[in-house]
C-alpha cells in the first residue's frame, strides 16, 4: 500500500481549506462594510452637530447691537421664507468723532479692526431721525472711506455699526443646506438634507427650525431671539 493521501482525501482537504478561506474573506468583507458604515454614520452625526451649533450661534447673535436702530427705524434683523432665513447683527460699534455732511465719503471714527473693506455699515442718529447703510472702501488717514456719498447730515457722536449678514438656504434638488456670509457665495453646510423649514413666531421673538436628513433623522430646534427688538 502506498502511504500518503489518496485523491479523494486530497480533494476533501482542499475543499475544506477553500471553504474556510471563503468564510474568512466573507467575514473580512462584512467587517469592512460595517466599519465603513460606522465611520459614515459618525461623520454624518458630526456634520449634523456642527450644523446645529452653527445655526444656534447665528440665531443667538441675531439683532445684536442693533436693538436701538431696529426699534426706531424698522430695520429687520431676521427674515425668513420657505427653506431660507437671514440674520443680521452688529460686529462692532464706534461713534463719529466729528460731524459728517451730505455728499461726504469719509467718516472720522476711532480705528477698529472690525471695520474692514467691503463690510456694510449702518450710520444713524435718533435725534435727527436719520439712518442709512453704506459700504467700506478703505480706512485711510484716520478716517473710514465709504463707497457711496452720504445722503444725510450726521452730527458727532452718531453711532456707526459694522454689520454681518448670514443667510441659510435649502437646495432640494441638491439635497443640501448651504450658508453664506455677507457678499460671499453659498457654501455647503449639510448634505443629504431631504427637508428644511423655519418658522418665526413674532409674538414670542422665537424661531422653530426643522432639518430632515435622508427622510429618516429629524432635528428640531426652538430658539428665543434674545437680541431681536421689533419696532
Q: Model-found features: residue ranges?
A:
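Mixed-charge, low-complexity intrinsically disordered regions
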Residues: 8, 35, 42, 52, ...
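Short linear sequence signals and composition-biased patches located at protein termini or domain-edge surfaces
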Residues: 76-80, 164-167, 172-231
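Short, exposed beta-strand "edge-strand" segments with a Pro/Gly-rich flavor and a Y/T-containing core
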Residues: 4, 99-100, 183-186
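Extracytoplasmic beta-strand-rich oligomerization domains located immediately C-terminal to a leader/signal peptide
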Residues: 34, 38-172
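Aliphatic-rich helix starts adjacent to a transmembrane/signal segment
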Residues: 2-56, 60
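Residue-level signal for the start and early helices of compact helical domains
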Residues: 22-25, 29, 35, 39, ...
Amino acid at each position: 500500500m502506498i502511504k500518503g493521501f489518496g485523491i479523494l482525501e486530497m480533494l476533501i482537504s482542499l475543499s475544506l481549506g477553500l471553504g474556510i478561506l471563503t468564510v474568512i474573506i466573507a467575514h473580512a468583507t462584512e467587517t469592512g462594510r460595517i466599519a465603513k458604515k460606522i465611520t459614515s454614520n459618525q461623520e454624518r452625526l458630526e456634520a449634523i452637530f456642527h450644523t446645529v451649533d452653527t445655526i444656534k450661534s447665528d440665531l443667538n447673535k441675531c439683532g445684536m447691537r442693533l436693538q436701538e436702530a431696529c426699534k426706531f427705524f424698522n430695520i429687520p434683523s431676521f427674515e425668513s421664507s420657505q427653506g431660507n432665513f437671514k440674520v443680521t447683527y452688529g460686529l462692532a460699534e464706534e461713534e463719529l468723532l466729528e460731524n459728517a455732511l451730505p455728499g461726504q465719503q469719509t467718516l472720522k471714527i476711532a480705528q477698529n479692526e472690525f471695520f474692514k473693506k467691503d463690510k456694510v455699515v449702518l450710520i444713524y442718529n435718533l435725534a435727527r431721525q436719520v439712518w442709512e447703510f453704506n459700504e467700506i472702501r478703505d480706512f485711510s488717514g484716520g478716517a473710514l472711506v465709504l463707497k457711496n456719498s452720504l445722503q444725510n447730515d450726521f452730527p458727532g457722536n452718531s453711532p456707526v455699526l459694522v454689520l454681518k449678514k448670514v443667510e441659510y438656504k435649502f437646495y432640494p434638488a441638491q439635497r443640501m443646506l448651504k450658508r453664506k456670509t455677507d457678499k460671499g457665495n453659498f457654501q455647503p453646510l449639510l448634505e443629504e438634507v431631504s427637508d428644511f423649514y423655519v418658522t418665526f413666531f413674532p409674538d414670542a421673538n422665537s424661531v422653530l427650525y426643522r432639518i430632515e436628513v435622508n427622510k429618516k433623522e429629524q432635528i428640531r430646534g426652538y430658539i428665543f431671539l434674545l437680541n431681536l427688538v421689533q419696532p
